[in-house]
Amino acid sequence: MAAIPSSGSLVATHDYYRRRLGSTSSNSSCGSAEYPGEAIPHHPGLPKADPGHWWASFFFGKSTLPFMATVLESPEHSESAQASTSTITCDLAQKAVGKQQPSGQPGKTTAGPRPE
């Protein structure tokens, strides 16, 4: 919790996003073309925006699987896309059920044909 000094106002210990003292421009925290070089340089402890990072595509909207978007958005492939999705879902569900084992029989699985 922040300590409130006796004067009644909070004082920031680091003003990384403020302009340099003596600036005649506005109070904005962004640099401007009129006053180049006034903004305080990037703090070394903060990460820089680098489009080379793996997570950059989440923010800039780059699709990592462009062929999937084309197939799923195409009306002529809508039935085959839905069929393959349901098949994959069904297969995954069967595999998940197959991996479950009853508590009394540790060596046997519950999926598959039962011997008669």
Curated annotation (Swiss-Prot):
Pfam families: PPDFL. Residues 23-32 have a biased composition (Low complexity). Keywords: Developmental protein, Differentiation, Phosphoprotein. The modification Phosphoserine is found at residue 9. InterPro entries: PPDPF (IPR026754). Residues 22-47, 92-116 are annotated as: Disordered. One of its GO terms (biological process) is cell differentiation. Probable regulator of exocrine pancreas development. Belongs to the PPDPF family. This is Pancreatic progenitor cell differentiation and proliferation factor. It comes from Bos taurus. The lineage of its organism: Eukaryota, Metazoa, Chordata, Craniata, Vertebrata. The gene is PPDPF.
